[in-house]
Amino acid sequence: MKKNILLLSLFIGLSSIAQDATRHFFYLGESKVKDMDVFRKNFPVQDAFTRKMNEGIMNNRVAHISETGSLYILSFIDGDENLGKYIANRATNNNKFREANPKIAEEMSNNTDGAWRRSTWIMINALEFLPADYKMENYNFRKIVMRTVPANEQEAFEKQQLQQHELGLKIGVKYLSVTWKAVDGYPTNTYMTILPDNSILDFYTHYADRQQKRYNSKEFNDSMKTGVKSNITRIDHLSRVY
């Protein structure tokens, strides 16, 4: 019953978002563990099982640890139908994993420190700034910025983000990023921008250069004084675990 309610609320939320030919999602699980070494030992087994059970449904999966000790496990899915299948089958697949790997499942459960928070996010296609050959496994670091915007100004916010990116390119500011919007699990006026790089050192070396170029541009600074005001709710630095 709870699963049906979740799916219903999810697709009601999706129905309010403009339809694209293929929509891109990720399903996010957040929690903490007591011992990262135990997680590192067991997660590859659980990950391989999850990939096998979701073959043809899930495109990719990646786990990160944040500087605050939180786990971020992201499962990437293309298309509404596949998203529905993934969510509908998740509990059943977890039960099958426990049956097939009881010792590992118990270790992982006992190692969890707190409840899991689960959420679903949809890519804002116009705010994807990644190369055609991008592979997430080639980048071991990600900065995430979560923010909320007024519910009635989301479209204006997305246009503003695109304009600022294009203005940045004019002054030589280049970086990788992709912005996602919450569908379920967070307020639906929440956006998450993910900025991948090779390492936190590389990211902030490049960041300092970008900030200097922005600081020197009157046009860019003027653009920041107007438009939709957003409220940053979280900044985190993620290191790839697996």
What are these regions (language model features)?
Residues 18-242:
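Short S/T/G/P-rich N-terminal loop/turn motif that feeds into the first structured element of a domain
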Residues 1-22:
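Bacterial Sec-dependent N-terminal signal peptides
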